[in-house]
Amino acid sequence: MGIFYVAEANRKIKTLELKAYDAMLNFDKAYNETQSSGYPYDFLSIMCTTCHVELAHTQEEIEALPNGTELLGVYPDNDIETWRDFLHYLAQALCSFAFINREGKLQLVQYAASPVCTVNNTHRFTSSFSDFVTRYTAINSTNRRTNTAEYYALDPDDALTMNLEVNPLLQFGLDETRSRILTNILNAISVINYVPFDSETIGDPALEPGDVLTFTGGQADETQMAAITSITIKVNGK
């Protein structure tokens, strides 16, 4: 649900088949480095103005995110081709993921540590749950200036490592600044403690990607949480 733009329409005998996309497609516009350094809100404002997408946040809300008040610079030797690439790196630096909300605005969301609702076995038709829990206790990030892979870990380091690869927004500044930013990212993703799942449920229009759920009944472990990564909605069906 939300605001979508029709890209293709195919007429059939009794129906009209539509293929539509949300405003995230606008960020596939070629990247133009109009500003080489700035604060996250500055970059988001330029990006949204250039790509004609409204930002869902105030400056105060962006600054409240981890690393939201850090001065970032764009490393000249980068692989950024579109504004969508740039958004990927910026959201990563802000310990968030980006999506277009139901109002058609760009929204950044952090990983949550508490569920928004519980789905019991009478509200789902099918479900399968992984036998392992996805959680992170370390990150790996490449420093282009030194051409070294830097490893940051919690104690104990007994889970997965998230590979941030080369983020062109995290290359400038003092070593202490880079270390602080990466430590903030590590602390933010350490709240991830989700069981991968797949479930066919009674439709709940309030749910969105990124929402965290708990399941009860059947084979579900009610002590574990699961995060929605994608939603498929069938109109007039399950």
Model region roles, listed by residue range:
Residues 2-7, 40-44, 165-171, 182-184:
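Short, mixed-charge, low-aromatic patches
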Residues 26-28, 207, 236:
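Residue-level signal for secondary-structure boundary sites
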Residues 10-131, 175-176:
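Charged- and aromatic-enriched interaction segments used to assemble
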Residues 1-20, 99-100, 211-237:
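Short beta-strand and beta-hairpin "edge-sheet" elements
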Residues 85-88, 92-185, 192-230:
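Acidic, small/polar-enriched beta strand-loop surface segments
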Residues 1, 37, 67, 72, ...:
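Feature targets compositionally biased, intrinsically disordered low-complexity regions
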